[in-house]
Structures are given as structure tokens and as C-alpha cells.
């Protein structure tokens, strides 16, 4: 045979690209690792982060001190390193907040650097939101491409409850960032089997525990199981790595717990939220299993698991889709669940298809030993199989985290606020980005059917959510429904008809899915938030907005945590930093059409979707949220929201304040926080947040007074159920009988240095 007659080398197997999409969902010719970064990817990521930063930083100071309970602890930590370490409510270290202090540390450092202001307190929270979006983008992009990462990051950024909490000073912002970081580290460990990633994940979980105790460990079981089953290392090494990760959790969380438990109780602040001055009691009781069972001694509304969740909404599988929860988090939840099931199913079946083809290649290789083309194709299939295994593991990780958190939140009977749902936001966003990218890259009719169905379901659910606020942007729900129908039909067109049509339909589908959340988020950004119970978006029909059913007054009135008749700007409104007026309220708790002109931060705001004079819910009206009805206001006013401190009251407390350990004492942390933030002097919070903690006892309080450590007692405020083992109610009675009353405007003080 002449050289010209000899057959040439076999042609290489066709490369797998996004354009050469397989025709079935289980085709083993799946696109593998994402292509190298295109020129548009980095600018797109920068744009996403800049838009997120602008959204979260815009008019940030309009919320004043937000949750004064935590702001007072931040102020204390900026004045005292001991208060910083323990998370004390005041710089004199009488009692701590009812959480570990990690979430307070970034804010306290910011206040030390920039001085006390709303901006200094809230900027770290906003930056945490930007960081969470960036980390989520990177975690999703690694296996599913830049488009998936951008979609996931964007979905997280505009989730209403995420925008709410990344502009607020509750611990949930830091917890969300740490959980995204923990999952990202576990995914890196699943990709390369390196121990350092699991150790870093353990550190994130440990710091999460120091942020919000056991909630940080909700997703530990599914992540550990997935790693134990899917890690690319030997089984024995997997368990060794998991043990090291567990050790990292213990060390990163345990150092603080050990110091607190070993520290002499007499020389540290009382552990707020506990009944016996113990952090472990707080962890496993009030903040732990009590949240599941409803048996929370010392909590708002008393202990005892009430059927159906008592004052915190009905429990059950539909809880997060209900009127007062749905608009916070559930916009993309149906899509995430559909894409989770589809992604796992597709990748599992593709695994079997790849295994079958590999077996066939091995048989051919045996017959044609040394044939280069067969060996090359077999190696390509091994690469595809490995990539599909990695993608499958990522679906299991994000899906496991979502299902574990969703199930817990749906059925827990204890305290449950709408803003807790931020924990679900990154898991939902990741699954939407991953699932959409997986189906888009595979192409074919089955993928088109699933994508079209997902868009249609999302548009339909968005219509339902928007219809719960019928007078707010009434055109939006119909627009979303129409665009969703067009997008679904466009995705069903044969791809050969026009690829441009398919791309346009996909873009339209993204717009449809995000239109509702974006509108809710813009409304949230344009509405000042304050108090202990806050929600995102406009008022809704049938929403409770908080534990209305569990307290006198029933329905909730007022959307920003203010009490009807005692709203921000009134006598019992929320204290704002210097230069900021409160948000006006009409008698009865109705929010005025326009806030007072002196309110800072209103200049240059985003256009508020549907902005108009609107009521925030009179007592008894469906949809009122954030504050209690009139009958509840008398009992709960100082418990959930702070007080407006007049200039005269501020001057009274500041006079000779340096001669005392505490300028004043008040029942409940919110009441004390208002005066502390106004004067920047320590104010003792008797009974902690609920006014029900036995700190201090009457005997101890008498000692403080006899030693000249407290100047004034602030009348008002409200102890929790039963007055907290008699402590706060006994102190109030003793003070009223013993000392001279001083009235300043609407506020009443007792001078503890002058007996009546």
C-alpha cells in the first residue's frame, strides 16, 4: 500500500460547545466546563456589583437608627471594648443583647472609625450585601458559566427581603453572607477535594454561630451528607476532612462561648434572653429549640407552643407563600423548586447515559487496542462524566440547603418574623441561575418545555403576589402576565426558526421573573424602616405583618414597625440621629401621605413605584404591618419600638451624667436604647429586650441606687409576660413609691437621688 493509499489518522471527536447543543436532556454530549471568560464578563460583574451597591446605599440614613436595640449595643461597643466583646446593651455592661455579638462587631468598628450615626451603623450591612452577591456569583459561575452567575447574583440583589435586611442592622445580613461563603467553600472542596476549603467552611459556620447561634447550622446536615457521598477523594479521607471541618467550627465558635461561660458572672454583663444568666441556656432555649417548639420562656407573648404557630402565623407547607410572607421571598421559589428537580433528574439520567457509552467504548477499545480515536473519545466522556458529577453535587448542595431551611421555617412554632426569610434568598437565586443555564446550554425540545413552563409558573405566581396589593402599581401584574405568556411561547418555538427569537424570549423571561421583586425592592429602598418588626414592599391584603394574632389589638397597623398612635415622630416614636426627623403618622397609626420635610435622606431617592398617599394599615385593616393595633399599643409600645427623646429630656439626662455609672434605667431594651442613643450615655435596660429577664433583681437594683450608680428611672416601657419573675414590675413599684417624680413634656422620670 502506497502512502497515498494509507488511511489518514481518525478524525477527532466533535467538540462540545453551547452551539452544538444535544437534542435530549440526557444526551451525554453535555457542555462541560464553562468557556474561558469572555470580554463582557468582567464589566458585567462590575456593573452588577455597582448597581447592588447603589441600591443598598441609596438614602441609607433615612431609616435612622433602624433597630435601636442593636444600635444601642453598637454605640456601647464603640465606647467600651468589654461591651464590644460581650455585645452589651450599654457601655456600663449591665446586660447583653439576646444574640452573640459577631454581627455587632463590624458596626461597632465602623462607629469607632466614623463616629455615631445612622450611616456608620448601616454601611457595613450594605457592603455585606454587595459581598454576598459577589460570592454567590463566583460560586455559581464556576461550573455553570457567567450567565448563570450573573442571573443568580442579580436575583439575590433584588429579592425584597434581602434588600430590606442588607439596609438594616439585624444579625441576618452577616449570617446570610457567612452562609453563602460556607456553601461556596464546600463547593470548592467538592471540586478539588482540598481540605482547606472545608476548614474555611467550618470557620464560616463557627462565625455564623456567633452571629445567630443554631440557625447557622441549619444547612450543616445536607452539606455534610453531600460531601460524604460525592467528594472526589477516598471515603476515609472524606470523613477525616469532615472531622477537621467540625473542629474548625468548634474552635471558631467555641473560643467566645468558653470565655463567656468561664468568666465570673459577677464581673460580666447578664446574658440577655436567658433566665439564669447562661449563654448555653440562651442558645438551646430561647434562641434554639424554643423557636421550633414554641416553648420560649421569657419571650414576647409567653412560652408554650400554640397550635398553628400562635401569634407568628400559621405553620405548614404553604406558610412562606402566605399573604404576609409571599412577597418577601417566594417570587422565584416555585421556579427554584422546578429547576432543582429538573436539574437533579437530568444530571442523574445523563450519568447513566455516559456510563453506558463508556462501557461501549471499553468494549470497542478491547477489540481495537491502541486505536487513538477510541481512546480520545473515551477520555472525553470521562471529562464529561466528572463535570456532570460536579454539577449534580452543586444542585444537591444548594437544593439541600433550600429544602432544610424551607422545611424548618414552614413548621417552626416559635418566634418567626418575615425578615428571617433572607436565609432562603441565596439558595433560591443559585438554583434559578444554575437550572436556567443548564437547560439553556442543553437545548432541545424537552429543555424548552421546562423553561417555558417555569417562566409561565413564575409569571402566574408573580401575578398572584402583585394582586395582593391591588391598588399598588395595578398595571404591573397585567404586564408581568402578558410578558410571561410571550416569553413562554417564544421559548417553545423551534430553535431553527430563529435563534434570535429564542434569545429574546429568554431575556423576556428574565425580565418577567424579576419585575415583581424589583418593584418590591424599590418600594422597600424608598421607605424608611425602623423597629423590631419590619417587612419589605407595599402593604398586602390579609397580611399579618407580625405577631398580631398573639397580642391584644389583633391586626398590625403601620408598615415600618411603628405603633399606631405612637409612630415615629410622635411621643413614642423612634429616635433618629441628629438632623433627622421622624416619619410622621396620623392618629390611629395611619402613615401620612408625605413625611415631614426635615426628614434626612429623602433627597435623590429612587422613584418609588406606585408612590402616592397611602395608608399603612389602620388597626384592624388587612394588610397593615409592622405595628400593633390600638389595644396592643399600650402594652407593646416600648417593647418593639423606641421612644422619641425631646431636647429637654436629653438635657436632663446629660446633666451630671458623668458622675454616674448609668445616666438612667428603663424597662425594656428598646425604651432604654432611645435615651442612650440620644445622649450617648449608658442607660440600663431592666429586664433586657422583653423586660422579662431577671436582671437586675430588686435587691440588686436597690444596691445600685444606694451606691449612687443610677441617676434617673424612666417611667413607661413595658415588661414582658408577668414582668419577668417579678423583677421589672417590683422595681417600677418601688421606684414610684420611693422617689421624686420629674415630668419633662410627655416623659416622666424619677430622680433616684431624691426621695419623695
Predicted segments with their positions:
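Luminal/periplasmic acceptor-recognition loop/helix of membrane-associated glycosyltransferases
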Residues: 631-672, 679-719
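Sec/Tat-exported extracytoplasmic proteins
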Residues: 78-82, 131, 287, 325, ...
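Solvent-exposed loop/turn segments at secondary-structure junctions
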Residues: 131, 161-162, 290, 540, ...
Amino acid at each position: 500500500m502506497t502512502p497515498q493509499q494509507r488511511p489518514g489518522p481518525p478524525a477527532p471527536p466533535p467538540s462540545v460547545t453551547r452551539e452544538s447543543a444535544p437534542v435530549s436532556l440526557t444526551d451525554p454530549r453535555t457542555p462541560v466546563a464553562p468557556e474561558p471568560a469572555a470580554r463582557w464578563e468582567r464589566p458585567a460583574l462590575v456593573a452588577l456589583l455597582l448597581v447592588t451597591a447603589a441600591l443598598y446605599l441609596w438614602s441609607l440614613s433615612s431609616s435612622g437608627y433602624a433597630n435601636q436595640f442593636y444600635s444601642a449595643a453598637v454605640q456601647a461597643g464603640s465606647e467600651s471594648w468589654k461591651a464590644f466583646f460581650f455585645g452589651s446593651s450599654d457601655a456600663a455592661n449591665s446586660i447583653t443583647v439576646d444574640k452573640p455579638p459577631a454581627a455587632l462587631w463590624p458596626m461597632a468598628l465602623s462607629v469607632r472609625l466614623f463616629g455615631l450615626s445612622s450611616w456608620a451603623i448601616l454601611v457595613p450591612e450594605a457592603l455585606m450585601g454587595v459581598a454576598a452577591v459577589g460570592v454567590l456569583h463566583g460560586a455559581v459561575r464556576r461550573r455553570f458559566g457567567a450567565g448563570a452567575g450573573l442571573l443568580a447574583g442579580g436575583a439575590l440583589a433584588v429579592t425584597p427581603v434581602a434588600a430590606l435586611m442588607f439596609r438594616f442592622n439585624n444579625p441576618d445580613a452577616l449570617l446570610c453572607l457567612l452562609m453563602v461563603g460556607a456553601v461556596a467553600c464546600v463547593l470548592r472542596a467538592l471540586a478539588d477535594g482540598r481540605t482547606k476549603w472545608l476548614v474555611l467552611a467550618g470557620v464560616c459556620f463557627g462565625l455564623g454561630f456567633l452571629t445567630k447561634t443554631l440557625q447557622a447550622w441549619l444547612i450543616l446536615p445536607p452539606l455534610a451528607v453531600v460531601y460524604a457521598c460525592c467528594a472526589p477523594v477516598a471515603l476515609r479521607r472524606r470523613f477525616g476532612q469532615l472531622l477537621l471541618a467540625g473542629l474548625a467550627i468548634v474552635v471558631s465558635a467555641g473560643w467566645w462561648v468558653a470565655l463567656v461561660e468561664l468568666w465570673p458572672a459577677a464581673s460580666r454583663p447578664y446574658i440577655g434572653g436567658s433566665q439564669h444568666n447562661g449563654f448555653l441556656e440562651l442558645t438551646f432555649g430561647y434562641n434554639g429549640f424554643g423557636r421550633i417548639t414554641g416553648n420560649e420562656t421569657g419571650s414576647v407573648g409567653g412560652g408554650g407552643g400554640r397550635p398553628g404557630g400562635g401569634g407568628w402565623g400559621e405553620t405548614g407547607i404553604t406558610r412562606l407563600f402566605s399573604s404576609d410572607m409571599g412577597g418577601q421571598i417566594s417570587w422565584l421559589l416555585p421556579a427554584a423548586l422546578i429547576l432543582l428537580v429538573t436539574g437533579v433528574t437530568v444530571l442523574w439520567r445523563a450519568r447513566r447515559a455516559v456510563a453506558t457509552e463508556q462501557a461501549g467504548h471499553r468494549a470497542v477499545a478491547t477489540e481495537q487496542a491502541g486505536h487513538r480515536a477510541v481512546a480520545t473519545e473515551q477520555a472525553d466522556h470521562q471529562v464529561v462524566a466528572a463535570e456532570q458529577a460536579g454539577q449534580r453535587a452543586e444542585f444537591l448542595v444548594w437544593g439541600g440547603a433550600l429544602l432544610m431551611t424551607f422545611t424548618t421555617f414552614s413548621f417552626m412554632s416559635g418566634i418567626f418574623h418575615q425578615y428571617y426569610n433572607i436565609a432562603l434568598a441565596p439558595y433560591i437565586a443559585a438554583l434559578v441561575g444554575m437550572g436556567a443555564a443548564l437547560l439553556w446550554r442543553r437545548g432541545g425540545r424537552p429543555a424548552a418545555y421546562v423553561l417555558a413552563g417555569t417562566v409561565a409558573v413564575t409569571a402566574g405566581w408573580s401575578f398572584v403576589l402583585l394582586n395582593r396589593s391591588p391598588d399598588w402599581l395595578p398595571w404591573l401584574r397585567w404586564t408581568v402576565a402578558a410578558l410571561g405568556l410571550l416569553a413562554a411561547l417564544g421559548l417553545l418555538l423551534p430553535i431553527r426558526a430563529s435563534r434570535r427569537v429564542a434569545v429574546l424570549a429568554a431575556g423576556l423571561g428574565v425580565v418577567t421573573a424579576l419585575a415583581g421583586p424589583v418593584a418590591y425592592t424599590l418600594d422597600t429602598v424608598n421607605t424608611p424602616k425602623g423597629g423590631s418588626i419590619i417587612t419589605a414592599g407595599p402593604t398586602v391584603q390579609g397580611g399579618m405583618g407580625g405577631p398580631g394574632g398573639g397580642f391584644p389589638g389583633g391586626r398590625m397597623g403601620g408598615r415600618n414597625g411603628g405603633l399606631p398612635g405612637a409612630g415615629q415622630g410622635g411621643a413614642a416614636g423612634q429616635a433618629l440621629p441628629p438632623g433627622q426627623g421622624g416619619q410622621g403618622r396620623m392618629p390611629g397609626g395611619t402613615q401620612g401621605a408625605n413625611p415631614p420635610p426635615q426628614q434626612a435622606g429623602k433627597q435623590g431617592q429612587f422613584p418609588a413605584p406606585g408612590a402616592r398617599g397611602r395608608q399603612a394599615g389602620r388597626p384592624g385593616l388587612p394588610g397593615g404591618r409592622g405595628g400593633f393595633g390600638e389595644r396592643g399599643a399600650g402594652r407593646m409600645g416600648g417593647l418593639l419600638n423606641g421612644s422619641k427623646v425631646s431636647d429637654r429630656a436629653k438635657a436632663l439626662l446629660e446633666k451630671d451624667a458623668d458622675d454616674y455609672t448609668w445616666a438612667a434605667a428603663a424597662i425594656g431594651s428598646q425604651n432604654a436604647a432611645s435615651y442612650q442613643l440620644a445622649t450617648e450615655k449608658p442607660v440600663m435596660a431592666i429586664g433586657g429586650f422583653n423586660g422579662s429577664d431577671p436582671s437586675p433583681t430588686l435587691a440588686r437594683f436597690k444596691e445600685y441606687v444606694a451606691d449612687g450608680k443610677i441617676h434617673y428611672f424612666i417611667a413607661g416601657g413595658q415588661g414582658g409576660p408577668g414582668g419577668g419573675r417579678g423583677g421589672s414590675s417590683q422595681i417600677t413599684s418601688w421606684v414610684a413609691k420611693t422617689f421624686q417624680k420629674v415630668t419633662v413634656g410627655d416623659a416622666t422620670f424619677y430622680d433616684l437621688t431624691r426621695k419623695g
